[in-house]
C-alpha cells in the first residue's frame, strides 16, 4: 500500500511516498513553496522516481504553510502534528523539536509517546528564520548554503545585537565596512538567530533528546550555535527537511487503514 505526504511551505515543497507505513520509497524537495509550481513539480519527480501514478496512492495528506491551497489531498493536517509524527518515527526518544522555517520558527514539546504536548512559535518577525539568513547571505554576497561551512572558520565572532532584520542589515554592512572577516560576520549572524530561537526553547523547557528539523538544520553553524545557547546536544536527522512530509505520509497510512476497515464492515 502506497501513501503520500506533502509539505507545502513558504519557500519549499517537499514530498514523501511511503510503502505500508514503513518504507520511504521516494522523497523530493523543491525550493519553491506555496503559490508556485513547487507542489506539482514535487509530484512529477515522485511519480517519475517510482513509476507510480495518482491512482496507485491510496491516500494523500498535505501539511505546511500552503496546505489549504492544495485541493488534491484527502486530508489537511497541521505541520506541528506532522513534524511530531515524522520525527518520532525516525528518532522515537525525541522530546523537543526545533523547526526553523522560511517564515517562522517553532519549538515543539513531545510526550513519551511522541505526541505533541505544547509548542511556541515566532512568526511576527523575520529574525530567527530562514528568510533572515537569505537576506544576510545576499548582503555579504555568498550563497546561503555556504554559510555553515564559512562560519566554522571563525576565530573572532562579531556581535549582531539587533533583533530586527532591518537594523541587523545595517550592523552587518557596518562590520563589512570595518573589514571584519566574512567568517566572523557569519558566525555572528548564526548566534543572532540562535539566541532568538533558543529563547523559545528555554521558555518551553529543554528536554532531551533535542532534534532540529527544517532546511536551516542543514546549516552546521546554526546547529552549533543553537547547541551552545541551550547547552544541549542537538540531533539532526538525515532528512531534516522531510520530517513534515514523512509525518503526513504516516497520517495518510492511518487514513488508508481506516478506509479499509470501513470497506470490510460494509
UniProtKB/Swiss-Prot annotation:
Disulfide bridge positions per record: none
Stored Pfam families: BcrAD_BadFG
Single biological process term from Gene Ontology: L-leucine metabolic process
Function: Involved in the reductive branch of L-leucine fermentation. Required for the activation of (R)-2-hydroxyisocaproyl-CoA dehydratase. The reduced activator transfers one electron to the dehydratase concomitant with hydrolysis of ATP. This protein is extremely sensitive towards oxygen.
Sequence positions that bind [4Fe-4S] cluster: 125, 164
Protein name: 2-hydroxyisocaproyl-CoA dehydratase activator
Gene that encodes the chain: hadI
Broad class of enzyme this protein falls into: hydrolase
Family as reported in the entry's similarity comment: Belongs to the HadI activator family.
Cross-referenced InterPro entries: ATPase_BadF, ATPase_NBD, CoA_E_activase_dom, Dehydratase_Activator_Redct
Required cofactor names: [4Fe-4S] cluster
Binding site for ATP: 10-14, 102-104, 134, 215, 241
Sorted UniProt keywords: 4Fe-4S, ATP-binding, Hydrolase, Iron, Iron-sulfur, Metal-binding, Nucleotide-binding, Plasmid
Enzyme Commission designation: 3.-.-.-
Miscellaneous comment: Only in the reduced state, HadI exhibits significant ATPase activity, which appears to be essential for unidirectional electron transfer.
Domain of life from the UniProt record: Bacteria
GO molecular function, one term: hydrolase activity
Complex and partners: Homodimer.
Cofactor annotation remark: Binds 1 [4Fe-4S] cluster per dimer.
